[in-house]
Regions:
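Non-catalytic positions within long, well-ordered alpha-helices that form the structural scaffold/packing
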Residues: 18-19, 70-71, 118, 167-168
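Ligand-binding grooves and catalytic loops that recognize ribose/phosphate and carbohydrate rings
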Residues: 113-124, 171-172, 189, 198-199
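Conserved, mostly hydrophobic/aromatic
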Residues: 17, 78, 125, 139, ...
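C-terminal active-site rim and adjoining tail of enzyme catalytic domains
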Residues: 151, 155-162, 167-181, 187, ...
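C-terminal helical cap(s) of enzyme catalytic domains, especially alpha/beta-barrels
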Residues: 39-48, 91-92, 178-208, 212-215
């Protein structure tokens, strides 16, 4: 189970994520209560061991600006939220960055988004709440008619208390958390980070064991 902790802001957050066993840490590079300037993000990304992926997260800025921010921040991956097109992803493909595409299931839309990982040239897909970053859960029952394929991460209102159940229902390749491991908005809690990573990885192990038993 791939676990990404998003919205880390300082060295203590980074240390907590690494110690907990997170596979990726996300740095907000555009408007957010968790936003970092590229210099701070670069310094924090440099602290990560090779096995932990540094991800720059952007929302709504032009693709060229997103790429510039990611390179300035020294991250190894770029996650794009918003109305980005295949052409936008193609324009970023030459950069030395792994690409993540974030989308959501809009209950008011008659046409679901493209849910096949790689459809836009991205390596990973993140399926989030329509109001991402606010800790709001969404109806996982929607996945019955629109389920992602490939390497996809579930996000939106996940916490240490509910992530195991969400994994059982959604069966994602990975999970992403931000506000669910905060003591107050924008303030990460090391214990909650530890609890979340452990709960997610233990749930995945239980799922795998059950699948083997039923094979």
């Amino acid at each position: 189970m791939f676990v990404k902790v998003c919205g880390v802001r300082n060295a203590a957050d980074v240390a907590a994520g690494v110690a907990a066993g997170a596979d990726a840490l996300g740095f907000m590079l555009t408007e957010s209560v968790r936003k970092l300037d590229t210099g701070t993000a670069r310094a924090l990304a440099a602290e990560l061991p090779p096995g932990v992926l540094s991800v720059g997260v952007v929302n709504g800025v032009p693709a060229a600006e997103a790429g510039r921010l990611a390179l300035a921040a020294g991250v190894r991956a770029l996650q794009l939220h918003g109305r980005y097109t295949r052409e936008d992803f193609a324009a970023l493909a030459h950069l030395p960055l792994r690409l993540l595409r974030a989308t959501h299931l809009d209950p008011d839309s008659a046409e679901p988004p493209e849910l096949a990982t790689g459809a836009y040239g991205e390596e990973m897909l993140l399926l989030d709440s329509p109001s991402y970053g606010r800790g709001e859960r969404w109806d996982l029952g929607r996945l019955e008619s629109a389920r992602p394929s490939g390497k996809w991460l579930l996000a939106g209102g996940l916490t240490p208390a509910n992530v195991a159940g969400a994994i059982r229902v959604a069966k994602p390749w990975g999970v992403d958390v931000s506000s669910g491991v905060e003591s107050s908005r924008g303030i990460k809690d090391p214990q909650l980070i530890r609890d979340f990573v452990a709960a997610a990885k233990n749930a995945a192990k239980a799922e795998n064991a059950e699948n083997v038993e039923n094979a």
